[in-house]
């Protein structure tokens, strides 16, 4: 923003008026990428691929290529620019229609450049040694799960989709470790970061080292995170098990001052911590409570199985003597089995005919011989959670497919 003040005129090309538009003299409406023709070039710059629009521009907007063409006083539309590039720099043995069908074409050798060898330059980068402590913390800035760098702040599906680790929605928070949380509570007794100790959570069975909930809503203390003498901002604390003891994680892309109706008033802006020397990693930070609290929309209030032994194990000797050992572990062991006519059947047979506790409905016959029986339920789903990366595409897809409304922070 300081550099823009020295320019005669400044233009902002964007799909929406935002903070950058406010400090520029002019705003140019940018077409959505699904409304534009474009061209992609491979990493080795030997092939190119077309980018075709899905629909014509809905509004009177311009694509990136059209703006550049106007600056060159050519005033061509994006389709003509892509066609001209294809005819002059690609393999002429393929016509434009086939290029669109195949999705790729070779570039002429004169356009291919040798990539610089950056491997050795990367190896010469020496990491800065720093050992964080309770009074000198390390701060890591990462893109926000809901908004990335802020461009999705006005997307209700993104904002309401729970963060895969913290399960937070509609907000961001400073993530700290349980070790640092206990240190801060010792230093500031009124901080209320962790639930009060009970006989159960002292043994790690219920809500160990997580958060304080009040009337079903998470109550998070607001603190001031200060890095150096000129970089600080206020945000709520969230205790996240698994973090390094004295590392604080903060996300960028939230708390925008100029955004649409959906993203207005959400999150906390941590961009004040960005400076030329940090490169998203800062050291020597401190945390100080402000005395205020913030309600976080956390959709998961507990983090333990609470007596449900989902994963059950034993040794080979005990299994040989007690094949049904799994039924005598966890809360399920307190409900007696009701096998009925299948009392003398094998365990494998019982599992396919009569559910434990005697179901209120008749168990469907899913054997191959009866697989085509009219009226038999054919739908099923199998999810391997070992392959889950936390992308949460399934969550947004479910909300979209089933027309589930966006309800906002208060009702999520």
What residue ranges belong to the model's regions?
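Non-catalytic, well-ordered alpha-helical segments in soluble enzyme domains
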Residues: 63-88
């Amino acid at each position: 923003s300081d550099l823009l003040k020295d320019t005669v005129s400044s233009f902002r090309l964007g799909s929406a008026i935002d903070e950058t538009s406010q400090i520029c003299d002019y705003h140019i409406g940018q077409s959505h990428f699904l409304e534009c023709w474009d061209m992609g070039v491979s990493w080795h710059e030997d092939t190119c691929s077309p980018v075709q629009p899905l629909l014509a521009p809905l509004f009177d907007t311009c694509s990136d290529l059209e703006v550049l063409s106007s600056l060159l006083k050519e005033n061509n539309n994006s389709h003509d620019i892509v066609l001209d590039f294809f005819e002059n720099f690609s393999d002429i043995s393929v016509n434009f229609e086939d290029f669109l069908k195949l999705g790729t074409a070779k570039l002429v050798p004169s356009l291919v450049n040798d990539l610089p060898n950056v491997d050795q330059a990367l190896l010469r980068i020496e990491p800065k040694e720093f050992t964080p402590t309770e009074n000198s913390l390390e701060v890591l800035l990462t893109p926000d799960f809901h908004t990335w760098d802020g461009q999705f702040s006005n997307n209700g599906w993104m904002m309401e989709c729970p963060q895969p680790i913290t399960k937070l929605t509609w907000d961001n928070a400073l993530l700290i470790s349980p070790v640092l949380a206990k240190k801060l509570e010792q230093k500031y007794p009124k901080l209320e970061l962790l639930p009060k100790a009970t006989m159960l959570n002292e043994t790690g069975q219920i809500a160990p080292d997580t958060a304080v909930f009040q009337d079903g809503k998470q109550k998070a203390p607001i603190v001031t995170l200060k890095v150096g003498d000129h970089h600080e901002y206020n945000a709520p604390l969230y205790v996240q098990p698994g973090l390094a003891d004295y590392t604080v994680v903060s996300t960028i892309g939230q708390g925008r001052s100029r955004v649409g109706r959906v993203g207005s008033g959400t999150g906390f802006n941590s961009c004040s911590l960005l400076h030329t020397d940090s490169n998203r990693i800062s050291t020597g930070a401190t945390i100080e409570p402000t005395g205020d609290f913030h309600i976080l929309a956390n959709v998961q209030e507990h983090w333990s199985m609470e007596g449900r032994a989902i994963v059950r194990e034993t040794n080979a000797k005990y299994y040989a003597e007690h094949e049904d050992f799994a039924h005598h572990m966890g809360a399920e062991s307190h409900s007696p089995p009701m096998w009925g006519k299948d009392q003398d059947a094998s365990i494998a047979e019982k599992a396919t005919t009569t559910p434990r506790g005697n179901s209120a409905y008749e168990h469907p016959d899913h054997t191959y011989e009866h697989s085509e029986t009219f009226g038999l339920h054919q739908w099923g789903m199998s999810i391997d959670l070992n392959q889950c990366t936390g992308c949460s595409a399934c969550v947004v897809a479910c909300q979209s497919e089933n027309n589930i409304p966006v309800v906002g922070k208060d009702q999520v």
